[in-house]
Amino acid sequence: MKKLFYILTMLLLCHTAWADKLELRLLNHWDNPDGTVERGYAGKSIWKWSMIPAGKKQMPDSLKARYEEYGRINQQYGINGTVLNNVNAKPIMLTHSMLQKTAKIADILRPYGVKVYLSINFATPKALGELKTADPLNPKVQTWWKKKADEIYHLIPDFGGFLVKANSEGEPGPMDYGRNHADGANMLATALEPHGGIVMWRAFVYSAQGGDRANQAYDEFIGLDGQFKDNVIIQIKNGPIDFQPREPVSPLFFALKKTKMMVEFQITQEYTGGSIQTCFLAPMWREFFDTLGTIKDRQPLAGAAGVANIGDADNWTANDLSMVNWYAFGRITNDTEASSKNIAREYLRSTYTTDERFVRPITQLLLKSRETMVDYMMPLGLHHIFAGGHHYGPEPWCNPKGWREDWLPKFYHRADSIGLGFNRTDHKERCLAGDEGSGNVNQYPEPLRSLYNDIHTCPENLILWFHHVPWDYTMRNGLSLWDNLCYTYDRGVAEADKFVDTWKAAAYIDSKVHARQMKRFERQAKDARWWRDACLLYFQQYSGMPLPPDSPAPTHTLDDLMRYHLDIDNYTAAPIDRLP
């Protein structure tokens, strides 16, 4: 079966060789040296640093076999690079012993056409005690990085380069020294340039004092357009907030005219159900590329990064069907015009069975899964109303003492007695928190700016992203916003119930895999009710309106849901048997 999958995939990639193929197609692992995986839901890290020898000793056979399999899968999926460690990088990753271990991984992956990259901590020379500063304009710092690059390329001649998260969420960066992003990125790029390496500098930056978080990446980078060296690529998340189930495209992709860019997708399901729920992400990425294609006056993408969803689980992703997203990332970045339906069918036929009694219904299930999840989680443009910290489950009321305002759901949903949603227009909309729009729409080129700015033309699946909409506002189907919100949540729950029935009737694959996945679909249906009840009961406090008469009564009470607390951290999958 694996050999057949390899042949079929190679044929597909050859067939799409003339399509819009991104040059860089990289996995980004958010794996830490201690084996934990930030936002990882498939066990511990596959990179067993404590088991990899630093000197001349050979890699243990068990690890070597696992990494060879990893290389083969990436080659089959069309992925040509991997960043081994978390963007919240530990300075230890650039010590000589860790670089020797990295070189051993690179040696194993090289035959499969997979280059190795590393995330770096910008303050590494200072953190390791080798310098007193990490100021990018300090000659000693520049020399340190040049020598470190020489050391890396001596060990790994085809090393890809650095991924950098700087001055974001507490990570160090050039702004600590009064410098800007270009100063920091260019210093690193100069060190890597003689070796052909690149710097991928993340645009995920925001601060508590910055106003609308959706504006901040644009505001911080637009003035630096054209100031970055040729081997610097700005890595931008697909949307302007943070991998929500639905976001508009980040306006930076349209704004930067003289700077190389790559898109960052999240394959791991931080906001889309972890390893419990099934959410086929190709439709989300298809939406991104389709929107990007509506604007012709823009820089082409230099590549794509996908935050990996794998761990040391036997099946790589814990949820068997989540592996389709690893495949989809490789497939759609090799052919940015690929259809979601074709991607789903290819994967199911080559992985499970060619029996259409399975392939046809499960293809349809996958194609519906993302929209269904949006419906029962954050419909109509709602966003950032998940549980604090671990992000699993609904918590639109989340308000821990001492947290920054822009980490709280209220900052984004802005529910009040007037309406719901975030006014990101260039004009006033009635809202108890203030009438003025954030002006986010003005970061978009025409016709997107006008489309989003007018409540009557704004796509209704983004209306609460861009507008504070009155509860009694009449939507295009003739119903009020409140009734539409209720019915959309209801539709999501009903579809999640259908997924259980569809999977149950498609028992044409390995019985153990089928049973394992059955438990996840049953839990997903319960999660859909959890989300629906939590959000409607919470927002009903503001709307003061009853549920429509044909809307099912809630299963839970708001008090019970607000008392429930899931005690896990950012490195742990939600326990399927301890949820409401």
What are these regions (language model features)?
Residues 18-163, 193, 280:
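Feature activates predominantly on carbohydrate-active enzymes
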Residues 14-15, 177:
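Hydrophobic alpha-helical membrane context
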Residues 30, 57-58, 133-345, 351, ...:
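Catalytic-core regions of glycoside hydrolase
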Residues 297-580:
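Catalytic domains of carbohydrate-active enzymes that cleave complex glycans
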Residues 4-13:
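Sec-dependent N-terminal signal peptides
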Residues 73, 85, 155, 191-195, ...:
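Structured segments of extracytoplasmic/periplasmic soluble domains
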